[in-house]
């Protein structure tokens, strides 16, 4: 009988005597990566042909997990078997316990990232003596602070544990965000934006890394798509809340925008406090005073959870979840240049829709809609945004295609921007609103790219750093985006939209180029791998010091 003893994304088998047998033809790099990934990851229930079926390989990884102090190593069992029904039931349980609360926490983050867009529809800028450019400066300060905190926050989280660090920063940003109710001038606005950026910066990469502790590689992208529906959910719910709360203008002598900041800060502070009890460190660490003395999972469920994750990706056990990424390992992760193309994609891909999204309510106010109407009219685009996000993420995972599917986001945006640039100033406000709604209904590819980045990292060490670096490039792009619409270009922002058109075209070409790059890298590795003898491959598999994406038997997804 043959058994797979593969590291992620490459297929190797052993015969019954345990000698390594590697398929000789891996010239089709996409096939060698994704076909194997599909076989290994999408199958539910245990099989005989898993990575640890060979005793020598199982012992190699057992020693590696012991050396790393992997927190779940006591549940590692190469001989464990389970049924597909058991695994399906367990995944549903993880979704309810882990994914739902991760989504709620993300809503708490995005509520405070986006409520400023609704507050400015209630004359916030005028009451603070500010204009559009001042608002842009504040957004830039927030994003620079957000970006600066990404990597340090990720490193602190890796040392303390996401279950400790994330609730702490959530409580912190809720208090600071609520204090915006007491703003009186531009300087205070800038100071609070800086503090918010520093506190919020590490949340997304930290929570994505935390989710990888519970899900297999093929399960993550679609769940991240559901995770990012928080963006549209918050925009819809936030618009409804704002439509009501902003009517409180005059209560206690306050503007409606002040009440908006205060009340939403109180709500998210409650979510932050609950997160101390609802975030377990990992699959086998759910027992505590809040979650119960028996925890959320039975012993058998813990065994299944740990072994299904490790058989999907053995590298998930090469670090403890309380182990810091030291300077040497950080430098190694930073030097993983083959990950850099994805960072460039993160830098530019989301720029085109960002200014129209940020300024939607403000633009609608400028072209004649009321505060109430401007907030409610944001809802249709957000609903369509969520639908398209789920569709594009599902299609990408279904056909195992990332780059081309991701390019559809900018292809979608392009014609709407062309229409906005060419539309005469005398056109009906409803026509302009319809074009903006169409643009902002684009298929958001962020879940695909985050999953792609995590998959190509191929180790916990690299994944912890690359998640932060990727999100840092995204925030860098947001800094650029926040300064494209300028005071002298309002209310139609035609000059800004022309700039967005050029970036749109660049993004499509970039994604095709990144796909070509990874195909080239895979073919180069195929050539090296196929030039090795069977004995050389066996020795390499069990003795190499190469880690993560540097392994010759690893193939990049694209």
Task: Label every model-predicted segment.
Residues 218-231, 251-330, 495-538:
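Central mid-sequence intracellular linker of multi-pass
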Residues 140-155, 379-391:
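Central cavity-lining transmembrane alpha-helices of secondary-active solute carriers
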Residues 399-449:
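C-terminal transmembrane helical hairpin of 12-TM major facilitator-type secondary transporters
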Residues 148-187:
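Conserved MFS/SLC helix-loop-helix module at the cytosolic interface between two early adjacent transmembrane helices
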Residues 117-118, 325-393, 446, 450, ...:
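Extracytoplasmic gate region of multi-pass secondary transporters
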Residues 97-132, 148, 153, 238-242, ...:
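Extracytoplasmic
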Residues 176, 188-202, 210, 429-448, ...:
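Hydrophobic core of transmembrane alpha-helices in multi-pass small-molecule transporters
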């Amino acid at each position: 009988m043959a058994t797979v003893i593969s590291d992620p994304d490459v297929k190797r088998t052993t015969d019954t005597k345990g000698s390594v047998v590697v398929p000789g033809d891996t010239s089709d790099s996409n096939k060698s990566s994704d076909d194997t990934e599909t076989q290994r990851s999408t199958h539910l229930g245990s099989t005989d042909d898993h990575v640890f079926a060979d005793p020598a390989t199982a012992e190699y990884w057992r020693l590696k997990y012991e050396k790393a102090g992997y927190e779940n190593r006591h549940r590692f069992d190469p001989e464990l078997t389970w049924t597909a029904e058991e695994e399906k039931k367990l995944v549903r349980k993880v979704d309810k316990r882990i994914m739902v609360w991760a989504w709620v926490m993300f809503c708490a983050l995005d509520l405070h990232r986006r409520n400023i867009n609704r507050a400015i529809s209630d004359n916030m800028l005028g009451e603070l003596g500010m204009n559009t450019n001042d608002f842009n400066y504040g957004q830039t300060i927030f994003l620079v602070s957000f970006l600066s905190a990404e990597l340090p926050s990720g490193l602190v989280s890796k040392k303390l544990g996401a279950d400790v660090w994330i609730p702490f920063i959530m409580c912190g940003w809720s208090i600071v965000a609520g204090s915006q109710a007491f703003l009186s001038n531009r300087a205070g606005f800038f100071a609070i934006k800086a503090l918010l950026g520093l506190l919020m910066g590490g949340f997304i990469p930290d929570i994505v890394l935390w989710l990888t502790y519970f899900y297999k590689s093929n399960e993550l992208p679609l769940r991240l798509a559901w995770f990012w529906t928080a963006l549209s959910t918050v925009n819809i719910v936030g618009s409804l809340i704002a439509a009501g709360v902003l009517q409180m203008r005059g209560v206690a002598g306050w503007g409606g925008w002040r009440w908006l900041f205060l009340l939403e800060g109180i709500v998210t502070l409650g979510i932050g406090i609950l997160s101390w009890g609802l975030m377990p460190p990992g699959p086998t660490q759910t027992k505590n005073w809040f979650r119960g003395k028996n925890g959320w999972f039975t012993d058998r469920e813990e065994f299944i959870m740990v072994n299904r994750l490790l058989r999907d990706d053995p590298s998930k056990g090469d670090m403890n979840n309380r182990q810091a990424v030291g300077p040497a390992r950080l430098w190694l992760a930073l030097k993983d240049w083959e990950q850099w193309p994805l960072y460039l994609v993160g830098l530019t891909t989301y720029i085109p829709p960002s200014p129209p999204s940020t300024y939607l309510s403000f633009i609608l106010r400028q072209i004649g809609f009321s505060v109430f109407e401007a907030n409610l009219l944001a809802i249709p685009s957000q609903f369509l945004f969520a639908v398209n996000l789920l569709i594009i993420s599902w299609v990408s995972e279904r056909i195992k295609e990332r780059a081309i599917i991701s390019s559809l986001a900018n292809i979608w945006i392009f014609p709407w921007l062309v229409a906005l640039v060419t539309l005469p100033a005398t056109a009906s406000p409803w026509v302009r609103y319809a074009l903006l709604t169409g643009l902002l209904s684009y298929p958001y590819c962020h879940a695909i790219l985050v999953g792609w980045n995590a998959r190509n990292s191929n180790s916990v060490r690299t994944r912890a750093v690359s998640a932060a670096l990727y999100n840092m490039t995204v925030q860098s792009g947001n800094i650029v985006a926040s300064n494209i619409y300028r005071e002298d270009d309002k209310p139609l922002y035609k000059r800004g939209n022309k700039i967005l058109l050029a970036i749109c075209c660049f993004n499509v070409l970039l994604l095709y180029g990144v796909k070509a790059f990874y195909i080239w890298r895979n073919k180069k590795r195929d050539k090296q791998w196929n030039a090795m003898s069977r004995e050389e491959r066996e020795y390499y598999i069990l003795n190499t010091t190469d880690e993560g994406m540097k392994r010759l038997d690893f193939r990049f997804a694209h």
